[in-house]
Amino acid sequence: MRNLFSFAATSVLMLGISSAFTSVMAQDSPYIEPPILTSQVAAGDLPAVQSRLPEVPMIVTLEGELSPGVYGGELRTLISRARDIRLMSVYGYARLVGYTPTLDLVSDLLLAFDVEEDRIFTLHLRPGHKWSDGAPFTTEDFRYWWEDVASNETLSPSGPPADMLVEGEPPLVEVIDETTIRYTWAAPNPSFLDMMARARPVFIYRPAHYLQQFHEDYGNSRTIAAAVEEANVSSWAALHNRRDNMYRMDNPALPTLQPWLNTTTPPANRFVFSRNPFFHRVDVNGRQLPYINAVNLTVAEGRLVPAMSNAGETDLQSRGLNFSDATVLRGGEERSGYQTFLWPDGKSAHFALYPNLNVDDPIWRRVFRDARVRRALSMGIDRHGINLSLFFGLAQEGGNTLQPLSPLYRETNFDLYAHYSPDEANRLLDDAGLYERGANGMRLLRDGRPMEIIIETAGEDPQEIDFLELVSETWAEIGVRALIRSSSRDVMRNRAYAGEALMTVWAGWDNGVATANMNPAVLAPTRQDTLSWPKWGQYYQTNGQSGEPVDLAEAAELMALYREWMASDDFEEREVIWLRMLEIHAEQQFIIGIVSAVLQPIVVSNRLHNVPEQGVYSWDPGAQFGIYHPDQFWFDPSE
């Protein structure tokens, strides 16, 4: 498993000085015009390619199994909801800084960045860089977002994003010149670069030239009023917010820096994203990227995605596919002209159980806060049987922790309380005072109720119910009855947030391959959506306005460690903090992981090149396909 990212590092290189990317002056390289744009250039509707690129573009060197490509083609993919067009900002993965497959942070949209004491960040933009409509991309776009959006009480009533605050305080933002801007905090902000490299980043810039027309401080009041009425919104701020969503990519008029731009106004069942003529990357032969002219996203019913993929109706597909579809997909390869790659999932656990330590029921709250109970429930699960039954034994069996791909992986954390041992589980439950049993052999709570755990599921993964039924069978051996309640994601989460759900099932942490420089907030009670402690997370996120203060020693230690990490500017110290937090999770079993590295089917057309056969399917870090740069994928016209 450790070799997957290493493979990617030699074959799918990311952006920046530390990779095989190099930057050269535009006048030193003969750039090639994408054929689809030549008529617009000839007609004078579009500048020539050398005028569209930054003065210092990003030159992409393709090595290993990758090769420079040719222009042309439209890539087809399927989405289950129209709002999933946001994946184009994920897959495009044009970021100020981005992760390499070896998990280094390097420049992308930025020419360079300087860091002092982990609290002073100077960002250098590429001179001559342009938005997709040809307008200059400069520090004015950063100033506008900070002063007129993030710090505007009408547009941002809660103030700037939490990621921009350190100990509740914002940075000093200094515009040095058109291509240089500096952010200075009084204390370290080790998450600043990471937050800009995520699948869903904090976009700290906006196309000011476009959005100012909707802003009360810049636009014409009569024009804004007319636009508010036409859009059927309540105010200029509502209009501005609707027009401004860099992540969702649902406004075709909003300029972008991604490799493809939306040309379809919602609602629609088919969305076309065409090439960005001002995209900043170029291959070694002088071809401006992307190679592919357009990406077509078709909305399809989720249950039909496997069949449509099997029929060859998509060129690149992962969404809507599960491991259970792999056999059928492999069977259609020859007939429909595609390959099925299997990438391990990058989450800390594919399936995980979340006992709610904040549940309202005082008896259950006391039960779940006893580490012996959580450990017993973990040891009462036959992970090997689940792996064989659902994943042909190909997944990794262990607890909720980082995967072997991570430099922070420790086998002891992965294995602790993760082996199937009904005898030990029974002993732990007895020691926890749950030794009384009813006539049917089920354990009784202290008030005489049967120990029946209702596990709530969103039912989005077809294998989830199968997994829970297998858990139910082995828990019965330790005197615990598991009942399954299926609802929707929102209903399940809201019941957990309100303290009504006893236990929920979800995946583990999105980032199962973390390094010490990545924010460990998800390991501490900082978020409501960590379903083991939603009310503690609420308390942190609302500064004590709602939820409950942490009142469990081990959880309090996690919070203290998180604060230490945030204040540290020393890598080794951060590593020690991460390892201690992971150790606490393994010992306490706050989240009961089952299996990880489940293989994700990736359907790839035989005509499509530069998609790595071996990869890691990770939301953060990785942006799923994003880290492998679809702008470098290309179609072979001879196939």
Cite the ranges covered by each PLM segment.
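Short, well-ordered beta-strand elements
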Residues: 72-81, 120-124, 142-145, 181-183, ...
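Ligand-site clamp/hinge motif
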Residues: 126, 247-251, 278-330, 375, ...
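N-terminal lobe/hinge region of extracytoplasmic solute-binding protein
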Residues: 39-117, 147
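Extracellular/periplasmic solute-recognition and catalytic clefts
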Residues: 149, 153-159, 173-174, 261-274, ...
